[in-house]
């Protein structure tokens, strides 16, 4: 089972014994006349929290101070949960969704429709679509979208395994559910041409503006998008 590759963030060196200067933190951590703003351990914690998506300097500071107030056992449980998830969660060998087993629960479920595959770019999209309770088929996670500017071509995505799955006689339809950004549209059109010789290819109808993200759509919008899918 392939593991999700995540680079471990390296701690930056201490500037001095009195202060830790974190380049990515937007607020000053420099030494003041009567002492430092943060101790080095707290500064390191704030910096690491700020690496998380959508977490800015103030949010990172608030989270760090909140964690310091919690009981040791609670903080240890959080740290252990993070380590366990990092160590155990990888990719499903079939659909490339997140899984702690070689094959994920969705792919193993006996009541899922094996004849329909919904193609998404990211595991978060699987979670969003599952919350609608409308789709009963299987999924395929590409691991991104075609983006030449970022050096991401078809070879960097899980397109070859998708072609292998679609070539099976039992597959009757492939639904392309990729967020409608410029890169998403490029990926959708590319896959449409690639998959049409094998099976019926449809794309979901979006109630989203161009450039919107699938994961942020509400459940009703996603459900209607699935119902209103059209053939490419």
Swiss-Prot record:
GO molecular function: DNA binding; zinc ion binding
Entry-linked Pfam families: RecR_C, RecR_HhH, RecR_ZnF, Toprim_4
Cysteines paired by S-S bonds: none
Matching Gene3D superfamilies: 3.40.1360.10, 6.10.250.240, RecR Domain 1
PROSITE patterns on file: RECR (PS01300), TOPRIM (PS50880)
Any GO BP annotation: recombinational repair
InterPro entries in the record: DNA_Rcmb_RecR, Rcmb_RecR, Rcmb_RecR_Znf, TOPRIM_dom, TOPRIM_RecR
Domain Toprim: 115-209
The entry's keywords: DNA damage, DNA recombination, DNA repair, Metal-binding, Zinc, Zinc-finger
Record-linked CDD domains: TOPRIM_recR (cd01025)
Protein's UniProt name: Recombination protein RecR
Zn-finger (C4-type) residues: 92-107
Function according to Swiss-Prot or TrEMBL: May play a role in DNA repair. It seems to be involved in an RecBC-independent recombinational process of DNA repair. It may act with RecF and RecO.
Homology family: Belongs to the RecR family.
Coiled coil: none
């Amino acid at each position: 089972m392939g593991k999700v590759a995540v680079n471990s963030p390296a701690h930056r060196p201490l500037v001095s014994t009195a202060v830790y200067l974190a380049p990515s933190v937007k607020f000053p951590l420099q030494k003041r006349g009567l002492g430092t703003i943060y101790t080095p351990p707290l500064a390191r914690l704030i910096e690491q929290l700020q690496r998380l998506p959508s977490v800015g300097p103030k949010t990172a500071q608030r989270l760090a101070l909140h964690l310091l107030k919690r009981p040791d056992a609670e903080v240890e449980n959080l740290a252990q949960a993070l380590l366990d998830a990092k160590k155990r969660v990888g990719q499903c060998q079939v659909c490339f969704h997140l899984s702690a087993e070689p094959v994920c629960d969705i792919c193993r479920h006996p009541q899922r429709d094996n004849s329909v595959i919904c193609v998404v770019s990211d595991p978060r999209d699987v979670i969003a679509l599952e919350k609608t309770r409308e789709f009963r088929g299987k999924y395929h996670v590409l691991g991104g979208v075609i983006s030449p500017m970022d050096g991401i071509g078809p070879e960097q995505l899980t397109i070859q395994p998708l072609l292998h799955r679609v070539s099976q006689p039992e597959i009757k339809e492939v639904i392309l559910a990729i967020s409608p950004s410029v890169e998403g549209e490029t990926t959708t059109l590319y896959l449409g041409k690639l998959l049409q010789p094998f099976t019926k290819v449809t794309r979901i109808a979006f109630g989203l503006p161009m450039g919107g993200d699938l994961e942020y759509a509400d459940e009703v919008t996603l459900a209607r998008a699935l119902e209103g899918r059209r053939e490419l």
